[in-house]
Amino acid sequence: MRRNSERPVRITEVCLRDGSHVMKHQFTEEQVRFVTRALDEAGMHYIEVSHGDGLGGSTLQYGKSLVNEMKLIEAAVDECKQAQIAVLLIPGIGTIHELKQAANIGAKLVRVATHVTEADVSAQHIQFARELGMEVCGFLMMAHSASVEKLVEQGKLMESYGAEAVYVTDSAGALLPHEVRERIRALRQSLNIEIGFHGHNNLSVAVANTITAIEEGATRIDGSVRCLGAGAGNAQTEVLLAVLDRMGYKLDIDLYKMMDVAEEVVAPLLPVPQEIQKGSLVMGYAGVYSSFLLHAERAAQRFNVDARDILIELGKRKVVGGQEDMILDVAAELAKIKMEV
């Protein structure tokens, strides 16, 4: 698992959480079991399972789940012989009640996610997760939208609450490699805990960004097999593993088996092939939260406007995750302007 004397790099596979956005939160228990079993057999370290917006996300605003996420988490735990199940929790969407439920049925890791400038809202959840005996990471979302200094300040807060790692989370897929480098380096120099990176492929640099993060000392990284994640997906896990192997990193994950998981297990589940289309490209370009894509496309159809215009305007307004209601407001405003022209 180690390269020379470096700390081990650990991967969290997010296709069953981030990929829930692509699936419109309609994963079945059988699908979760099938994917989890295959990932576990391949040697994956962590497998994240929950609604796309984390615990408690099954709402009208974020999208209703077909199956209660606790049943999906329980099914995933049941299929694992060596991998550990992770969950995402966004304070204000998920609660400590749901976190306790997830822990009780076997989830071992929680990533507590906040907007990059709002780490203070994570204190209660991080501390409670530690009391539950869970492994706890902080997840600073929309990391492109804050200065490096602000990112470090917020990372230090999460560290002080008890987080065992802090992630630079490129929710919009907007960061370029040099921007990842300066952020990871600054956190590595300022914090005494592990640093992680979560990328999105909206500008086709998710794998490059992840490699850059590792080169700067990140030891926790995310991938989504077959790029099954919001927007254009995340760093494609099987590709990432191949690159890391070429670079000399040995992660004890079977590359051939991960290729097979991508081709034979996950690909048939995809509603459409994961590729960088104009909507996801605009999200990376404008710096918009990746899970906004489907909401923007639906709003564009409803109000007869261009989804790209909606996303660009959301980027200008610096709308963040949790403000999905703004998408309809922007679409309505654009439609009104269109009628007046």
UniProtKB/Swiss-Prot annotation:
One of its GO terms (molecular function) is 2-isopropylmalate synthase activity. Its EC number is 4.1.3.39. The gene is dmpG. Mn(2+) binds at D18, H198, H200. The keyword Manganese applies. Belongs to the 4-hydroxy-2-oxovalerate aldolase family. One of its GO terms (biological process) is L-leucine biosynthetic process. Signal peptide: none annotated. The lineage of its organism: Bacteria, Bacillati, Bacillota, Bacilli, Bacillales. It catalyses: (S)-4-hydroxy-2-oxopentanoate = acetaldehyde + pyruvate. This is 4-hydroxy-2-oxovalerate aldolase. Residues 9-259 form the Pyruvate carboxyltransferase domain. PANTHER family: 2-ISOPROPYLMALATE SYNTHASE 1, CHLOROPLASTIC-RELATED, HOMOCITRATE SYNTHASE-RELATED. NCBIfam families: 4OH_2_O_val_ald, PRK08195.1. Keywords: Aromatic hydrocarbons catabolism, Lyase, Manganese, Metal-binding. It comes from the Bacteria. It comes from Bacillus cereus (strain 03BB102). Substrate binds at R17, D18, S171, H198, Y289. The active site is at H21. Gene3D superfamilies: 1.10.8.60, Aldolase class I. Pfam families: DmpG_comm (PF07836), HMGL-like (PF00682).
